[in-house]
């Protein structure tokens, strides 16, 4: 039976999904879980994980799971399982060069999108589309990416980002429209024919394109102060680390600026731009930490900085270099911006809570249970990725794989992290309480941390923008105005 199911499980999963029957889906999940437990890493296991993700995603839809019910401590268990399974499937598909990689990547984007994490979904919807390949991902990914771009563009206060998102959405829809006869996905075909936003985008596409071309010429005229700046900007762009939504659709010169700011917001007359200034401090800290990481990863510091320190070795090829220490410092700085962001969230949204603010699921759930905002949802679920739940009782959602990043942060702050290339030790190790990792592992983790923090800052700005759109022009206790905040670069001299 197991041998037969191993050969037919993809078809069996499709049948279970098509049935729409919970009992059938549960039975298939149980059989596939058993098969998975006896399988080793490889293409077959990647496909099993992909199928498990699809089964749980379908079950979540049937049971009407909601991603915003974390406010009542009701968690979409099947949706979380679906996301985690497809993440594992994607990692394994890359490792073993799966021919199914684009379908898995598109489903990963669909799962992330379901949690309102639209910025991250855009990343996974992006690949070289080939409309001659008769696979669903070639049509689903560009359509969904275009939809996400159009959804976000109206909340982007920076005009150049809005123009970019409109143009890239138009470009995708225009190409799909030109290849309509090749579309095999029924749902996408129907959407292309019937959706009003698609028709409007195609109608106004030529003017969008003209506006984009004018802007593109202007943005491409950037002048560098020196070669180091050019190399640094290119590194930030390629790694999608600019605080700029344009960097999510392109990685070249027009994205080379940290444009996001605290949106214009309603205040009482006479009140200063303190929320905006607080966000500027967070933004500045992130950008300086990013430059520190760039230098730590790319520019060797002098060896004499370690001379005369008499550092102890445990004979495991430890790395005490200044570069490695600065990677650690950069990670701590990046993480520190998240707790500062939590404090700003508390103050801007006028949350009445005592004690410290922490960017973690428990604090966000307790503090934002009465605020409905899709980008607060995004921040909540992003915080879940960064949470080590080993010792947290007041949280019921499963811990995603990225919890190792939070553990790294905690050990950098409260324990110690040894960078070592050794595969074994000559010691008993009973006194060894360090977290150990290689230079490659901590370097990869650092980039991942910075991407998470960058995305969190963008989601926060979108949350504020969304909230301001819902606000009335007047508060009940007095006359208010919208504050357009001054920037540091606008001031030729200090105010005082």
Language-model segments: residues:
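Short coil/linker segments at helix-helix boundaries
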Residues: 59-81, 155-168, 305-315
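Short non-catalytic regulatory patches outside canonical folded cores
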Residues: 315-415
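Residue position in alpha-helical solenoids
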Residues: 31-38, 92, 131, 172-182
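Charged alpha-helical initiation segments
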Residues: 1-12, 20, 60, 206-327, ...
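Amphipathic alpha-helical repeat scaffolds of TPR domains
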Residues: 2-19, 40-70, 97-114, 137-156, ...
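Helix-turn-helix repeat elements of alpha-solenoid scaffolds
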Residues: 16-35, 72-88, 114-127, 163-168
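TPR/TPR-like (Sel1-like) alpha-helical repeat modules
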Residues: 126, 157-184
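Amphipathic, Lys/Arg-enriched alpha-helical patches that create a basic surface
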Residues: 406-408, 426-496
């Amino acid at each position: 039976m197991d041998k037969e199911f191993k050969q037919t499980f993809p078809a069996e999963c499709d049948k279970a999904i098509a049935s729409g029957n919970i009992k059938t889906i549960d039975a298939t999940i149980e059989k596939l879980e058993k098969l998975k437990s006896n399988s080793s890493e490889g293409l077959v296991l990647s496909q099993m994980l992909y199928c498990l993700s699809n089964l749980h995603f379908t079950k979540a839809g049937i049971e009407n799971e909601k991603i915003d019910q974390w406010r009542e401590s009701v968690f979409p268990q099947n949706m979380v399982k679906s996301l985690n399974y497809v993440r594992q499937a994607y990692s394994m598909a890359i490792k073993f060069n799966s021919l199914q990689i684009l379908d898995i990547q598109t489903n990963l984007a669909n799962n992330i999108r379901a949690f309102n994490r639209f910025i991250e979904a855009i990343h996974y919807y992006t690949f070289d589309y080939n409309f001659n390949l008769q696979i669903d991902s070639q049509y689903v990914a560009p359509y969904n990416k275009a939809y996400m771009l159009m959804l976000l563009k109206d909340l982007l206060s920076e005009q150049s980002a809005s123009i970019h998102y409109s143009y890239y959405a138009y470009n995708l829809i225009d190409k799909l429209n030109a290849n309509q006869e090749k579309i095999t996905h029924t749902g996408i075909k129907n959407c292309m024919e019937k959706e009003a936003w698609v028709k409007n985008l195609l109608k106004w596409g030529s003017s969008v394109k003209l506006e984009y071309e004018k802007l593109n010429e202007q943005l491409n005229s950037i002048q560098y102060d020196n070669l180091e700046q050019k190399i640094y900007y290119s590194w930030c762009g390629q790694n999608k680390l600019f605080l700029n939504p344009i960097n999510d659709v392109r990685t070249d010169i027009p994205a080379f600026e940290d444009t996001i700011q605290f949106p214009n917001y309603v205040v009482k007359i006479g009140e200063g731009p303190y929320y905006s200034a607080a966000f500027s401090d967070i933004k500045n800290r992130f950008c300086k930490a990013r430059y520190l990481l760039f230098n730590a990863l790319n520019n060797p510091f002098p060896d004499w900085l370690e001379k005369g320190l008499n550092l102890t070795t445990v004979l495991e090829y430890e790395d005490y270099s200044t570069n490695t220490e600065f990677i650690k410092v950069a990670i701590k700085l990046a993480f520190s911006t998240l707790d500062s962001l939590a404090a700003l969230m508390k103050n801007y949204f006028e949350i009445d809570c005592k004690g410290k603010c922490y960017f973690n699921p428990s604090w966000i759930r307790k503090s934002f249970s009465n605020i409905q905002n899709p980008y607060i949802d995004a921040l909540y679920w992003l915080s879940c990725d960064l949470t080590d739940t080993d010792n947290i009782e007041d949280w019921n959602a499963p811990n995603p794989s990225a919890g190792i990043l939070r553990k790294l942060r905690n050990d950098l702050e409260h324990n110690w992290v040894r960078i070592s290339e050794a595969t074994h030790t000559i010691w008993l190790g009973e006194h060894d309480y360090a977290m150990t990792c290689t230079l490659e592992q901590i370097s990869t983790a650092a980039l991942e941390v910075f991407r998470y923090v960058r995305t969190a800052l963008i989601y926060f700005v979108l949350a504020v923008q969304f909230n301001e759109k819902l606000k009335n022009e007047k508060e009940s206790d007095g006359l208010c105005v919208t504050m357009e905040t001054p920037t540091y670069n606008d001031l030729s001299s200090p105010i005082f």
